[in-house]
């Protein structure tokens, strides 16, 4: 059995108290939470597709005569299997059907709807996620990558003006709608920017939303002070500003608010008979000690004084023209921020604002509550804002209010004032509390919102143009509107990627990737250093090691092993709760925001036998700092040393001894390892190998306890045991009585042309438990990831051949196929119906020898098992020429001699240059319908098969129903309308039970009331009936699908009548030029392959397999490879495998101890002898076993040389690159080299006849063929391009041939 073989000696000192989650959970959960396909209609949550559809409906026309409402949605089963879709170039999808209700009436003012029509409407097809977390789109396996983007909510930041003054800003970022930014300037005022357009003062916005008077705005910020007019106060009041208008009742003279009080004005106010006045508070007498002068300065500079003036200012600044009237300006502002259709903060945006401004909201509610006048005004504004919003909360701002409110705007200004006073902190935009993940479900929801908005617009137009004639929902809905948006997302989005399938690790990493790029994200050019850098909040959430090396460095990351994404899109990581120094077993999932200001300690700190921290002080982590704190101050402890890195980095043993840059390369290069002919798991592993193999779905595992009943190379059958009830199987109605068949993948081509093949690990009669590995993949061994080979290595120079990281290999690795890999190439030919006639696959090709056709079958397709080389025919095909009409004489000759050669031309598909291999599989698909009789017979056969299936199902249902209910007394069985169908007291006999099997009864029975008094029996009967309904529908769907396939023939992409696919397998041995690497970033190219007898050998005559340059270790600082080398040698000698988890593995002393146990030198060095001379090398050499990978950078795919080939249309210079059969660029520096040597003739040739002198190169070719002298070069085409560009600038350039 597999388990015995994979046991490893474990060096870990710390055991994790929880298992890491399923590594594909991030993809699978997100998609299934979006579509909720397995959730009953009544229990569907308001999320994903359900929420999108609820938001898109109801739709009404402008006259108010029609109302289209949404009820529910459902999916059909996929028409084809995953394999069929890949083979035929189709999309693995399901059809979405939505139940809609259309109501209409004759007049808008009628209270009731005249008639309602309920109908299920087809809304298009949605790509469906496979159980591996991928999508099949047009036959290609794709992955939707999660996006890390700026979280909706409010973000506070600061900038420094050139004069040294700090300026603060607050941005409110919604999920959908206009961005609003509040910004202080150097003159101590607050401006508002909406969508980064022109700015206006914040007081104008406050007036526009309802705080019309200066006094109202000042009162909001507690800036109004009532001062009695005594002579003693004269000095205090002079220089202050009036908060409200002063009216002299006798003269009618008005001293307006904002007027600075002078001696003169003071006297005027006294004469007007005022006992006290309201003034704006000055900072000096503000009892709270907070300078709010920024509001006063803003008011004093505000040109508006009324709500109407403010509305005009806001409208003019944003629309760049005058408002037609005040109502238009008011409705524009309401639409921009207070309308749910146009503005949506989203659940996350509202949550973030409430969390960030919690204290400001509390202060605001408390302050407004104490001022009756202000409370009344605030309530009026709130009522106006929320009148269109259905709210369920008693708070002024509940979680369900997803538009902006006046409270949000005022609280943001409160916080800005605190920032100005140094009493608050700005946000860190790179903090993971301010960045969230949009996984596949959310991205799909966004596409549906776009598609349904377009569909809604079309429906409104149709409803508006309709008269009172009857219409049904299906007349209004065009399915293409929605499905075209979803299809274009999968085909063209930057986040929908062609899956990297080189090996299982590459596949899984692609699915766990988190990208900051994509729509609504960053761009490579704009992203600075800070956003790419590792942040302290990445701890346990995003891997600090695994990221690409190129321009995307830091923008694309991988989720850490234990990381999960919560329902709000924030990344969480688990911690153990620590209570007063006591480490508990309670595990909590913390987001970056939850963890902020908490003190956490690593899992490696010493604990006593009672799980208390055994030392008084510990080095802990809080924010980005590492202070030494008392054990009693610790809040949380890590759950595992592995939790900070991703799965790929966790596979690198002794990672703790490697430099970060090399660890990055090691993690990335494991993803490029090609599966080899035979796979070896590493002798020195980390314990993650089995987890990655299982979670990537590369291996097949048992679903529960059972027994293997049949094993072949193509399938494994397991009979699972009964469950806990001892009478319920995996499915009560399972016809196979718990028997499950697992089909094995055989020689399947991956997206990267590597080979995927599974082989069984179990035998007939083997007992299996849950998660027992049943079958291995091409990249696993006994259920563990196996990407490379364990080979004997020596670190030494060898005659200069391993200079600059080159690798020297033994010929044994070639002969024994140690690093041989299989690559499968797919070639596709299709038949189209062209204007000139239909193309045809055939063996009958004119002017082609019988020798060339020897391997083709009667359809013109190469036979399986044939060995082919370049230019061999794979698929014979002819296509019509479409020549001019033949003369009568030609027609007669053709009729007599049957010469068809001039009608058609050979369009056969050949093996491309440089390729040879064996044909392992061919497929032919045809759209053409079979003849009528054939179809009729097939459909009759299908009907018989499915009728038998259904009969069998009903028989099993009756058997189980009898088992549960026979002889028991009914408590009353009701239908869904409350009508009794089996009266209370009825004994369940065969005649009564027969009712249950009828379709009408099963559809209408109300299961919630129960059928008998026993709860257990009711539970079993309910489960049985639900299962029966489901399986019955399953059979009906399957029958329809099979009939469709028979009627339609093979479904193919549009325009294609027939499709032929040919698969060529190549065995590629390791050769000079191939790239290899270890797991520590120790990469190199094979420089020389030596005969075994020339390799350095040990004293016992054992030659080494591979020689690496020792100079590649010290400067790279990846010492982990030396630890691995020595421990690997000990493992091979002892015949065991080791498990050394990262940060928790073998120490230097333990490696020495294992070497000693194996009878090897403890320093890991031995004397080696030169294979060529037999002499001993002067110094001892580090020798051992290292795990080496062959990477998918093979020299066969890269080597290329051009003779003549295609040229660029504009410059007429040869194209570049292997794909274009291009040449090597002869660039500026190469020109300098020829100039330096004075090689004038070669230089002239390079720049003219060998490049873009079109006339010259043709003449040169002619001269070479005829054996004549070469002609004089002409003018290069690039010179003509330069001339034309100058002419385009208006400069006339003429070439004067007469100049001597």
Swiss-Prot record:
<dbReference type="Pfam" id="PF04565">
    <property type="entry name" value="RNA_pol_Rpb2_3"/>
</dbReference>
<comment type="subunit">
    <text>The RNAP catalytic core consists of 2 alpha, 1 beta, 1 beta' and 1 omega subunit. When a sigma factor is associated with the core the holoenzyme is formed, which can initiate transcription.</text>
</comment>
<dbReference type="InterPro" id="IPR007644">
    <property type="entry name" value="RNA_pol_bsu_protrusion"/>
</dbReference>
<dbReference type="Pfam" id="PF04560">
    <property type="entry name" value="RNA_pol_Rpb2_7"/>
</dbReference>
<dbReference type="InterPro" id="IPR007121">
    <property type="entry name" value="RNA_pol_bsu_CS"/>
</dbReference>
<keyword id="KW-0808">Transferase</keyword>
<dbReference type="GO" id="GO:0000428">
    <property type="term" value="C:DNA-directed RNA polymerase complex"/>
</dbReference>
<dbReference type="Pfam" id="PF04561">
    <property type="entry name" value="RNA_pol_Rpb2_2"/>
</dbReference>
<dbReference type="GO" id="GO:0003899">
    <property type="term" value="F:DNA-directed RNA polymerase activity"/>
</dbReference>
<keyword id="KW-0548">Nucleotidyltransferase</keyword>
<dbReference type="InterPro" id="IPR007645">
    <property type="entry name" value="RNA_pol_Rpb2_3"/>
</dbReference>
<dbReference type="GO" id="GO:0006351">
    <property type="term" value="P:DNA-templated transcription"/>
</dbReference>
<dbReference type="InterPro" id="IPR010243">
    <property type="entry name" value="RNA_pol_bsu_bac"/>
</dbReference>
<keyword id="KW-0240">DNA-directed RNA polymerase</keyword>
<dbReference type="InterPro" id="IPR014724">
    <property type="entry name" value="RNA_pol_RPB2_OB-fold"/>
</dbReference>
<comment type="similarity">
    <text>Belongs to the RNA polymerase beta chain family.</text>
</comment>
<dbReference type="InterPro" id="IPR007642">
    <property type="entry name" value="RNA_pol_Rpb2_2"/>
</dbReference>
<dbReference type="Pfam" id="PF00562">
    <property type="entry name" value="RNA_pol_Rpb2_6"/>
</dbReference>
<dbReference type="InterPro" id="IPR042107">
    <property type="entry name" value="DNA-dir_RNA_pol_bsu_ext_1_sf"/>
</dbReference>
<dbReference type="InterPro" id="IPR007641">
    <property type="entry name" value="RNA_pol_Rpb2_7"/>
</dbReference>
<dbReference type="InterPro" id="IPR007120">
    <property type="entry name" value="DNA-dir_RNAP_su2_dom"/>
</dbReference>
<dbReference type="GO" id="GO:0032549">
    <property type="term" value="F:ribonucleoside binding"/>
</dbReference>
<dbReference type="InterPro" id="IPR037033">
    <property type="entry name" value="DNA-dir_RNAP_su2_hyb_sf"/>
</dbReference>
<keyword id="KW-0804">Transcription</keyword>
<comment type="function">
    <text>DNA-dependent RNA polymerase catalyzes the transcription of DNA into RNA using the four ribonucleoside triphosphates as substrates.</text>
</comment>
<dbReference type="InterPro" id="IPR037034">
    <property type="entry name" value="RNA_pol_Rpb2_2_sf"/>
</dbReference>
<dbReference type="Pfam" id="PF10385">
    <property type="entry name" value="RNA_pol_Rpb2_45"/>
</dbReference>
<dbReference type="GO" id="GO:0003677">
    <property type="term" value="F:DNA binding"/>
</dbReference>
<dbReference type="Pfam" id="PF04563">
    <property type="entry name" value="RNA_pol_Rpb2_1"/>
</dbReference>
<dbReference type="InterPro" id="IPR015712">
    <property type="entry name" value="DNA-dir_RNA_pol_su2"/>
</dbReference>
<dbReference type="InterPro" id="IPR019462">
    <property type="entry name" value="DNA-dir_RNA_pol_bsu_external_1"/>
</dbReference>
<protein>
    <recommendedName>
        <fullName>DNA-directed RNA polymerase subunit beta</fullName>
        <ecNumber>2.7.7.6</ecNumber>
    </recommendedName>
</protein>
């Amino acid at each position: 059995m597999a388990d015995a073989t994979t046991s490893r000696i474990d060096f870990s000192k710390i055991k994790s108290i929880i298992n890491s989650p399923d590594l594909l959970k991030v993809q699978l959960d997100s998609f299934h939470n979006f579509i909720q396909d397995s959730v009953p209609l009544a229990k569907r949550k308001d999320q994903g597709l359900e929420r999108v559809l609820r938001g898109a409906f109801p739709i009404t026309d402008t006259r108010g005569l029609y109302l289209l409402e949404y009820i529910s949605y459902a999916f059909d089963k996929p028409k084809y299997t995953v394999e069929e879709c890949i083979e035929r170039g189709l999309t693995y999808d399901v059809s979405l059907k939505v139940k809609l209700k259309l109501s209409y009436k004759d007049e808008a003012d009628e209270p009731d709807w005249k008639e309602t029509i309920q109908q299920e409407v087809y809304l298009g097809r949605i790509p469906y996620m496979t159980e591996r977390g991928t999508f099949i789109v047009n036959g290609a396996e794709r992955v939707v990558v999660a996006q890390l983007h700026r979280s909706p909510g409010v973000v506070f930041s600061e900038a420094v003006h050139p004069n040294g003054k700090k300026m603060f800003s607050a941005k409110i970022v919604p999920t959908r709608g206009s961005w609003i930014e509040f910004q202080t300037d150097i003159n101590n005022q607050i401006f508002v920017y909406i969508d980064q357009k022109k700015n206006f003062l914040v007081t104008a916005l406050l007036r526009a939303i309802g705080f019309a008077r200066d006094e109202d705005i000042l009162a909001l910020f507690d800036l109004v002070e009532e001062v009695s007019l005594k002579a003693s106060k004269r000095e205090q009041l002079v220089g202050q500003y009036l908060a409200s208008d002063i009216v002299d009742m006798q003269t009618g003279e008005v001293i307006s608010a904002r007027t600075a009080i002078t001696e003169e004005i003071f006297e005027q106010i006294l004469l007007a008979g005022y006992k006290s006045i309201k003034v704006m508070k000055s900072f000096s007498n503000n009892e709270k000690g907070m300078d709010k002068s920024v509001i006063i300065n803003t008011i004093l500079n505000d040109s508006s004084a009324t709500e109407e003036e403010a509305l005009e200012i806001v409208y003019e600044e944003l629309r760049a023209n005058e408002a037609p009237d005040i109502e238009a300006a008011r409705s524009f502002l309401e639409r921009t921020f207070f309308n749910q259709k146009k503005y949506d903060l989203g659940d996350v945006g509202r949550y973030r604002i409430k969390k960030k401004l919690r204290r400001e909201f509390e202060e605001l509610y408390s302050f407004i509550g104490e001022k009756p006048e202000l409370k009344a005004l605030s309530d009026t504004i709130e009522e106006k804002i929320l009148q269109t919003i259905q709210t369920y909360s008693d708070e002024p701002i509940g979680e369900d209010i997803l538009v902006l409110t006046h409270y949000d705007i005022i609280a943001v200004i409160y916080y800005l004032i605190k920032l100005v006073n140094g009493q608050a902190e700005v946000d860190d935009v790179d903090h993971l509390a301010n960045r969230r993940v949009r996984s596949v479900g959310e991205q799909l929801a966004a596409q549906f919102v776009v598609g349904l908005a377009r569909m809604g617009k079309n429906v409104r137009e149709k409803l508006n143009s309709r008269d009172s004639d009857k219409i049904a929902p299906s007349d209004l809905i065009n399915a293409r509107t929605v499905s075209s948006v979803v299809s274009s997302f999968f085909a063209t989005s930057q986040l929908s990627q062609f899956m990297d399938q080189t090996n299982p690790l590459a596949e899984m990493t692609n699915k766990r990737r988190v990208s900051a790029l994509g729509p609504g994200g960053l761009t490579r050019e704009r992203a600075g250093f800070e956003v790419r850098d590792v942040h302290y909040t990445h701890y346990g959430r995003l891997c600090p090691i695994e990221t690409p090396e190129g321009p995307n460095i830091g923008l694309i990351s991988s989720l850490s092993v234990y990381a999960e994404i919560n329902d709000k899109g924030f990344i969480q990581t688990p911690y153990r709760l620590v209570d007063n120094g006591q480490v508990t077993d309670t595990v909590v999932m913390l987001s970056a925001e939850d963890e902020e200001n908490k003190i956490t300690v690593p899992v490696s700190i010493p604990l006593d036998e009672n799980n208390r921290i055994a030392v008084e002080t510990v080095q802990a982590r809080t924010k980005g700092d590492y202070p030494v704190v008392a054990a009693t101050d610790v809040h949380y402890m890590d759950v595992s040393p592995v939790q900070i890195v991703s799965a790929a980095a966790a596979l690198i043993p002794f990672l703790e001894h490697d430099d970060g840059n090399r660890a990055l390369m090691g993690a990335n290069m494991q993803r490029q390892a090609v599966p080899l002919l035979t796979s070896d798991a590493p002798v020195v592993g980390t314990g993650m190998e089995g987890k990655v193999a299982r979670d990537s779905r590369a291996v097949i595992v048992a679903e529960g306890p059972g027994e293997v009943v049949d094993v072949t190379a193509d399938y494994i059958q397991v009979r699972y045991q009964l469950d806990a009830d001892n009478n319920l199987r995996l499915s009560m109605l399972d016809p196979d009585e718990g028997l499950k068949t697992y089909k094995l993948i055989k020689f399947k081509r991956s997206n990267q042309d590597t080979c995927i093949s599974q082989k069984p690990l179990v035998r007939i009669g083997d007992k299996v438990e849950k998660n027992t590995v049943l079958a291995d993949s091409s990249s696993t061994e006994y259920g563990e990831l196996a990407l490379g080979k364990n080979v004997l290595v020596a670190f030494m120079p060898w005659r200069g051949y391993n200079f600059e990281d080159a690798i020297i290999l033994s010929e044994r690795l070639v002969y024994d196929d140690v690093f041989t890999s299989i690559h499968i190439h797919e070639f596709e030919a299709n038949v189209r119906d062209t204007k000139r006639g239909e193309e045809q696959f055939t063996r009958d090709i004119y002017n082609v020898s019988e020798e060339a056709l020897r391997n083709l079958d009667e359809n013109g397709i190469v036979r399986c098992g044939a060995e082919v080389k370049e230019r061999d025919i794979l698929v014979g095909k002819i296509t019509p020429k479409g020549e001019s009409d033949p003369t009568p004489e030609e027609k007669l000759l053709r009729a007599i001699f049957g010469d068809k050669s001039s009608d058609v031309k050979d369009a056969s598909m050949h093996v491309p240059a440089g390729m040879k291999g064996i044909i392992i599989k061919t497929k032919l698909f045809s759209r053409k319908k079979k003849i009528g009789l054939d179809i009729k017979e097939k459909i009759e056969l299908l009907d018989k098969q499915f009728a038998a299936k259904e009969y069998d199902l009903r028989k099993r249902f009756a058997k189980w129903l009898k088992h549960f209910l026979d002889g028991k007394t009914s408590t009353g069985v009701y239908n869904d309308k409350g009508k009794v169908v089996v009266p209370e007291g009825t004994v369940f006999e065969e005649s009564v039970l027969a009712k249950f099997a009828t379709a009408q009864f099963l559809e209408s029975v109300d299961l919630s009331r129960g059928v008998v008094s026993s709860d257990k029996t009711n539970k079993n009967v309910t489960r049985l009936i639900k299962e029966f309904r489901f399986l019955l529908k399953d059979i009906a769907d399957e029958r329809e699908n099979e009939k469709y396939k028979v009627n339609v023939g093979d479904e193919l992409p549009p325009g294609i009548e027939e499709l032929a696919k040919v698969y060529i397998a190549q065995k590629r041995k390791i050769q000079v030029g191939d790239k290899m690497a270890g797991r520590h970033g120790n990469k190199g190219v094979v420089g020389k392959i030596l005969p075994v007898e020339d390799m350095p050998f040990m004293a016992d005559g054992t030659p080494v397999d591979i020689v690496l340059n020792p100079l590649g270790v010290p400067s790279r600082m990846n010492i982990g490879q030396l630890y691995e080398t020595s421990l690997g040698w000990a493992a091979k000698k002892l015949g065991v495998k080791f498990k050394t988890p990262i940060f928790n593995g073998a120490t230097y002393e333990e490696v020495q101890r294992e070497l000693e146990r194996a009878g090897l030198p403890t320093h890991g060095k031995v004397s080696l002898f030169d294979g060529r001379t037999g002499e001993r090398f002067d110094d001892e050499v580090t020798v051992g076993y290292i795990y080496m990978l062959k990477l998918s950078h093979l020299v066969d795919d890269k080597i290329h040389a051009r003779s003549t080939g295609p040229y660029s249309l504009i410059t007429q210079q040869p194209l570049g690159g292997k794909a274009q059969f291009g040449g090597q660029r002869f660039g500026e520096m190469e020109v300098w080299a020829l100039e330096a040597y004075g090689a004038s003739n070669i230089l002239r040739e390079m720049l003219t006849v060998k490049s873009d002198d079109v006339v010259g190169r043709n003449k040169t070719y002619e001269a070479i063929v005829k054996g004549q002298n070469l002609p004089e070069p002409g003018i290069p085409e690039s010179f003509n391009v330069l001339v034309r560009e100058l002419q385009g600038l208006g400069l006339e350039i003429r070439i004067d041939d007469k100049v001597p």
